[in-house]
Amino acid sequence: MRRLRDYSLCLCLLLLWPLAVNADDSWRQIQTEAHGQTVWFNAWGGDPAVNRYLAWVSEEVKRYYAIDLRIVPVADAADAVKRIQTEAQAGRRQGGSVDLLWINGENFRTLKQANLLLTGWAESLPNWRYVDLQKPVREDFSVATEGAESPWGSAQLTFIARRGQTPQPPTSPQALLAFARAHPGSVTYPRPPDFTGTALLEQLLIALTD
């Protein structure tokens, strides 16, 4: 097996969120202001394990912080992005239907360029000290995050080969391209717009066009 890419799963806060978080606020003050509030978290709902985890998290934040975390499963984050844009265009600057969003790079860029994301909060999170800064966590889709996005997990794309048929599998993007050309139809991946397939092609394009 060969790992081809490391990518992050990121969360963003929307400017329509009713709780304003200032850079100089203490975390205790933020907790106090959040007490009793409802947070609408739009997240991809396609993974049963993640869904169970988020259900557990919602129970925990209710128990310990009196925050009502409402999980809104979405098939595509782009749908939530469109809803956010529509609400902003209608002049809804508070109490929007999306407070927290599990987002990918393309949708992050769209919202940030439209000035619809709250900035400056991510690195003030207590758990930011656990973030691996060797990874490109301060840039997404070639856009500086400016504290508007926090990674909450990571995953890796892995190349899997049958050793009996492929005793020396490719170990680089260049070798994978050469292998695919020499063995047409032998390399498979999820067809875009599947997220994993798109991520693979993005990584290969970046590596092969340097």
Predicted regions and their residues:
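Short, polar/charged alpha-helical segment
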Residues: 27-35, 42, 47-68, 159
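Boundary at the C-terminal end of the N-terminal hydrophobic targeting segment
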Residues: 21-23
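Extracytoplasmic ligand-binding site segments that recognize negatively charged/polar headgroups
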Residues: 44-56, 72-79, 94, 98-210
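Bacterial N-terminal signal peptides
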Residues: 8-18
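Short, well-structured alpha-helical segments in soluble
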Residues: 84-93
